[in-house]
Amino acid sequence: MARIAGINIPDHKHTVIALTAIYGIGKTRSQAICAAAGIAENVKISELSEEQIDKLRDEVGKFTVEGDLRREVTLNIKRLLDLGCYRGLRHRRGLPVRGQRTKTNARTRKGPRKPIKK
């Protein structure tokens, strides 16, 4: 297994799909990384040489991924909470942040229904 950005990349998958195992890299960014490194998208990770894997590591290193990205997202949410703005209050209350309706739906964000005790 190749290790890129501290993550074990699955050997049996194609390069584009395997790179999406890294937090912060989706399919589009993965395709861009493969193109920049000069690696075909349909080649499996196990078929790559060490030089090609090093090229992939260099290209992935240009982006904010994994722990740094998680930390950045957490700090952004914490900043909103500290500001006390509307979005911060929605985060604090565990409600949808981006204007979705909450009279019905929003169950994922609000959690399971709490029965009214009589």
UniProtKB/Swiss-Prot annotation:
GO MF entry, a single one: tRNA binding
Domain of life the protein comes from: Bacteria
Keywords: Ribonucleoprotein, Ribosomal protein, RNA-binding, rRNA-binding, tRNA-binding
Disordered as annotated region, ranges: 94-118
Claim: tRNA processing is one of the keywords in the record: no
GO biological process: translation
Gene3D superfamilies: 1.10.8.50, 30s ribosomal protein s13, domain 2 (4.10.910.10)
NCBIfam families: uS13_bact (TIGR03631)
Physiological role: Located at the top of the head of the 30S subunit, it contacts several helices of the 16S rRNA. In the 70S ribosome it contacts the 23S rRNA (bridge B1a) and protein L5 of the 50S subunit (bridge B1b), connecting the 2 subunits; these bridges are implicated in subunit movement. Contacts the tRNAs in the A and P-sites.
Annotated family: Belongs to the universal ribosomal protein uS13 family.
Protein name as it appears in the record: Small ribosomal subunit protein uS13
